[in-house]
């Protein structure tokens, strides 16, 4: 990964920080924006596929189906800090099912994003019917992120692929 030095500039705190502590430099990843954009775009594509596959795609375009883009942005901002595919999938289920970034299809999109994250980590879910009921319960607020992670650990197995 290429690392570049970037001077922190702008903003009230940064001006105060420079006055008190001198010039401050921060190491940033050169490909950070592309990673974030890839996450955001992937979620939009998954959502679009979910809506098309269930016959619910309306005349709206891909961007028009987003109700709360800040929820997707928040998810993509914190995703990289989670250590493994199970905790990332738990975050996806909790975040997308509860923050409702889309007009329709939030639970289905949460499920598909979680499946994609698990597959990326070499894991598969055991039973889709049980998973569907679990996702509904999550959306009703019956489980928090830690409960979701425990459930995923008990209901996944190594992929044969």
Task: Cite the ranges covered by each PLM segment.
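FIC/Doc superfamily catalytic core
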Residues: 1-161
């Amino acid at each position: 990964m290429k690392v570049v030095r970037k001077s922190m500039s702008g903003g009230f705190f940064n001006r105060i920080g420079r006055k008190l502590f001198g010039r401050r430099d921060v190491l940033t990843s050169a490909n950070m924006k592309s990673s974030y954009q890839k996450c955001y775009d992937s979620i939009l594509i998954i959502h679009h596929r979910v809506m098309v596959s269930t016959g619910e795609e309306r005349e709206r375009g891909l961007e028009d189906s987003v109700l709360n883009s800040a929820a997707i942005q928040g998810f993509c901002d914190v995703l990289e800090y989670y250590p493994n595919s199970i905790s990332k999938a738990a975050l996806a289920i909790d975040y997308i099912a509860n923050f409702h970034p889309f007009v329709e299809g939030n639970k289905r999109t949460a499920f598909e994003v979680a499946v994609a994250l698990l597959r990326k980590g070499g894991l598969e879910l055991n039973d889709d019917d049980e998973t569907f009921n679990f996702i509904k319960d999550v959306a009703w607020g019956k489980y928090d992120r830690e409960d979701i992670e425990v459930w995923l650990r008990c209901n996944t197995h190594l992929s044969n692929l």
